[in-house]
């Protein structure tokens, strides 16, 4: 075993060698309020962004999948961070705080992503807004306009969770 598995196994063996007794494992299902509180603690967030995606890519003749959803969301946050922080982002020293939610829905609904993005105090709001729009124009799977608004409160996170917590991705 290598990497994290080795450390996890080693930690488990150490715990067992100290005669720790685990009575039973309980599967806990958190409430919506607990999940919203957890997501809110990942902030602070300054921007609420929604972007529509294509159901089918016109050139590659492929339909959107959850993997493409996630890659598109991560790519967008990465482009915005690269534009704002340049080398600091490339070397892992600075990035925007962000979470996003994938919403696919039925055949009649357009797939889209919802973002909650936090920014640093050192950055001007105009500069961040410019990079949010600029990164959107470089995206491959997007369709239509982007909707960018100031993040108001955790009500946006409640809206995130309407399709379930499994659709939320941290960046």
Language-model segment annotations:
Residues 43-47, 94-96, 109-113:
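Residues at beta-strand starts and edge strands
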Residues 11, 15-48, 56-73, 119-171:
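Catalytic "initiation/cleavage/transfer" segments centered on a nucleophilic residue
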Residues 66-101:
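Surface-exposed, low-hydrophobicity interaction/linker segments
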Residues 40, 90-92, 105-108:
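Short, conserved, surface-exposed binding loops centered on an aromatic residue
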Residues 1-3, 9-10:
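Nuclease-adjacent, charged terminal/linker segments that flank catalytic cores
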Residues 98-121:
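Histidine-centered divalent-metal-coordination microenvironment in nucleic-acid enzymes
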């Amino acid at each position: 075993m290598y990497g994290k598995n080795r450390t996890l196994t080693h930690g488990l063996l150490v715990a067992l060698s100290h005669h720790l007794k685990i009575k039973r494992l309980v599967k806990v299902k958190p409430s919506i309020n607990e999940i919203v509180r957890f997501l809110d603690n990942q902030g602070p967030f300054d921007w609420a962004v929604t972007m529509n995606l294509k159901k089918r890519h016109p050139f590659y003749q492929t339909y959107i999948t959850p993997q493409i959803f996630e890659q598109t969301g991560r790519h967008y946050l990465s482009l915005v961070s690269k534009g704002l922080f340049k080398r600091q982002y490339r070397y892992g020293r600075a990035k925007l705080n962000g979470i996003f939610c994938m919403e696919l829905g039925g055949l009649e609904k357009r797939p889209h992503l919802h973002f909650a993005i936090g920014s640093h105090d050192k950055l001007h709001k105009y500069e961040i807004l410019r990079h949010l729009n600029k990164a959107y124009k470089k995206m491959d799977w997007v369709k239509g306009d982007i909707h960018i608004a100031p993040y108001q409160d955790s009500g946006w996170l409640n809206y995130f969770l309407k399709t379930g917590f499994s659709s939320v991705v941290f960046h």
